[in-house]
């Protein structure tokens, strides 16, 4: 059992570093978003979603909004996993009600990508981090993030989100050299992006591997584990001991291999991961994050409260960050979020 840490200035950061707290710190994936009326008001002031991401004044405002409403332990910078392909020069847009749309990448198009442009193009994100950092209370953790290479590649190849990632999986099998080159580009771009986020004030970063499902063990090792391992190592070569949360959604039985090989400080669990499996299969001192079903939060009521309490109890003997198993959905009533935070804050 990891000893309970003495009170620290940033409970969430302390937890990521392996210290149990008296109660789990909490943040919520997509906590700055459409379920908040104040977010919708800001969103209406800008022309496009990417414009919101690249306007530091507005991006900092929406980053801070959920912390004004709820006693959350962290802010996560408002951005998107697809800012990297945008920075690389791929055409990226967001259609209302349809999600992201990209010009699909081809093997021939890889040479047109501009890895050297990433940090310059994403300077507004770093300014947003600096603005948020200056406004945060000292006990709040600031989280940066990026999409992991496999997940970002699925969008770059298909041109949109895909529930089975078939286009990317087929591309990887039929064009292995081009796919390996694409992953290399994304690894290096991600390292540069995350290092710059740390230097702009991020306390911890999260790697979003949102599409880790639908891969066999060999593909998972090559497309998920190895690129994420390289990113963590590359970031720490410049920012020693940089704290990293990995979130390989849908990894299921391959979670232990990911945890062992990638080198993340904490492991995000989706809501399909049984608590007993996580406790039995993962190292006892490894911090975990999660894993309430977002639909339980949207539905609210006693079922949500009981499941939240079960998760807190289930991970009571290891460092635990309370979160959802995926992003909060827009239909979620703000009252349900307030009730969840209340339950977590009382520690049971």
Residue locations for each model-derived region?
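N-terminal small/glycine-rich loop or linker at the start of catalytic domains
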Residues: 19-51, 81, 87-96, 103-106, ...
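N-terminal basic, low-complexity leaders that serve as flexible interaction/assembly modules and, when applicable
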Residues: 1-87, 91-94, 131, 230, ...
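A gly/proline- and charged-residue-enriched helix-loop-helix capping module
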Residues: 97-135
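Active-site loop segments of alpha/beta catalytic cores
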Residues: 123-348
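Generic low-complexity segments that are intrinsically disordered, proline-rich and/or Lys/Arg-biased
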Residues: 4-7, 26, 101, 241, ...
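A short acidic, glycine-rich active-site loop
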Residues: 52, 111-118, 171-174
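General structural signal for secondary-structure boundaries
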Residues: 11, 48, 103-109, 116, ...
């Amino acid at each position: 059992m990891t000893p309970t840490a003495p009170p620290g200035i940033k409970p969430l950061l302390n937890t990521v570093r392996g210290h149990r707290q008296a109660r789990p710190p909490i943040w919520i994936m997509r906590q700055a978003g459409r379920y908040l009326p104040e977010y919708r008001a800001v969103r209406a002031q800008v022309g496009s979603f990417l414009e919101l991401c690249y306007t530091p004044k507005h991006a900092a405002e929406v980053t801070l909004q959920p912390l004004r409403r709820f006693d959350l332990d962290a802010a996560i910078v408002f951005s998107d996993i697809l800012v990297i392909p945008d920075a690389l020069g791929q055409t990226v847009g967001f259609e209302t009600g349809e999600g992201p749309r990209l010009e699909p990448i081809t093997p021939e198009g890889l040479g047109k990508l501009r890895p050297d442009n990433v940090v310059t193009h994403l300077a507004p994100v770093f300014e947003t981090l600096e603005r948020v950092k200056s406004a945060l209370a000292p006990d709040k953790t600031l989280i940066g993030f990026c999409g992991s290479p496999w997940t970002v590649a699925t969008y770059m190849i298909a041109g949109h989100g895909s529930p089975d990632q078939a286009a990317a999986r087929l591309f990887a099998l039929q064009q292995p050299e081009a796919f390996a080159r694409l992953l290399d580009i994304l690894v290096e771009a991600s390292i540069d992006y995350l290092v710059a986020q740390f230097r702009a004030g991020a306390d911890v970063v999260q790697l979003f591997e949102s599409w880790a499902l639908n891969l066999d063990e060999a593909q998972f090792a090559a497309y998920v584990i190895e690129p994420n391992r390289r990113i963590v190592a590359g970031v720490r070569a410049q920012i020693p001991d940089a704290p990293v949360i990995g979130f390989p959604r849908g990894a299921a039985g391959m979670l232990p291999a990911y945890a062992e090989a990638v080198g993340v400080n904490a492991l995000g669990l989706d809501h399909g991961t049984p608590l007993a499996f996580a406790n039995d299969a993962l190292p006892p001192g490894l911090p975990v994050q999660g894993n309430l079903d977002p639909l339980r939060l949207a539905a609210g009521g006693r079922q949500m409260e009981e499941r939240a309490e079960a998760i807190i109890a289930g991970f009571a003997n290891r460092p635990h960050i309370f979160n959802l198993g995926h992003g909060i959905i827009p239909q979620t009533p703000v009252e349900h979020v307030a009730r969840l935070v209340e339950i977590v804050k009382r520690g049971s």
